[in-house]
Amino acid sequence: MNIKGVNLGNWLVLEKWMNPALFEGTTAEDEYYLPTQLSPEVYEARIKIHRSEYITERDFVTIKRMGMDSVRIPVPYFIFGDRKPFIGCIEELDKAFNWAEKYGLTIFTLYR
């Protein structure tokens, strides 16, 4: 079985090297330390904007048009929002599953 896919990294699990602007004004090197160096309001605003804009339905359309058949989505351990101060992201993952189904893509997840 051949799989043609793409990794949707830095959407639900942040990678500083892929989007340093999210870490602006901090010395945090990863998502674990980011909320300790920002006010709760600033942290929440950055995360919500990032998640709503970084990967969208349009990306799933593009992935399908490029001939891909699958996407890999790294998923954080705080996906359900039960690990303060982190903000859950199950709603975004639900959207991804809906978009994948709509465009005939398979999803692989990576739990962290």
Regions found by a protein language model. Give the residues of each.
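N-terminal carbohydrate-binding accessory modules
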Residues: M1-M68
